[in-house]
Amino acid sequence: IYEAYGLPFTRFEFDANTIRFNAGGRGWVCNMQNYLCTSGGDVTDDGRGGRGGRGSGGGAPTVLSPDGTRAVFIRDDNLWVRDVATGDEQPLTRDGIKDYGYATDNAGWRKSDRPVVLWSPDSNKIATFQQDQRGVGEMYLADTRPSHPRLETWKYPLPGDSVITVVERVVINLEDGTMVRLRMPPDQHRSSRCDDIICGGSWGDVQWSPDSSSMAFLSTSRDHKQEWLRIADISSGEVHTVLEESVPTFF
């Protein structure tokens, strides 16, 4: 039993129904409906933003489902899911390759191993993307140190480049293992709030409907002059643009 001002953790994650934290060397998920807590995996934020934590799967950061029963992580450029209770792991995608992987959190100047996903409210579907950086130009940085310097390389498209980073939006259904690609051209690796698809540590501009049957998202032009609000039917992949806005300067 712990006092309110002496809790055994300094960080925690939460959503509308659960709170997740580490205590006693284990990860805990507490259901706020019945106030029951179960242990399973290390779920504390790894300090690089967002709601991801580190679980099994080779120590890769994971993102828990809203009901706390499953966690997804990246392995070899593909997205995997782990059962929190049993530890069983299964691949959700199989065709991811270097520079064309799933749920990739890599803007070049900023990157992490945490998957970029958004769970549906019913915990049965995942919105994510396959990020295409094949053929994109590279930037280099020499990391100086007392011993030999280390050369760091990352993808960095420059103004005027014809080959740039894009994302192909997909939805994965965990109930039957199917994946639906949204029927639209690839989106720019942008958001309405910054030059990265991740802003403030979370994947913004994407929202599920309460019944998990559709989702809304924003598409942003590379120059931040145009925005498109779109609705996707996740069973068919059909996408409808419901609002378009443009400005002479930038958003």
Predicted segments with their positions:
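Beta-propeller folds
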Residues: 1-251
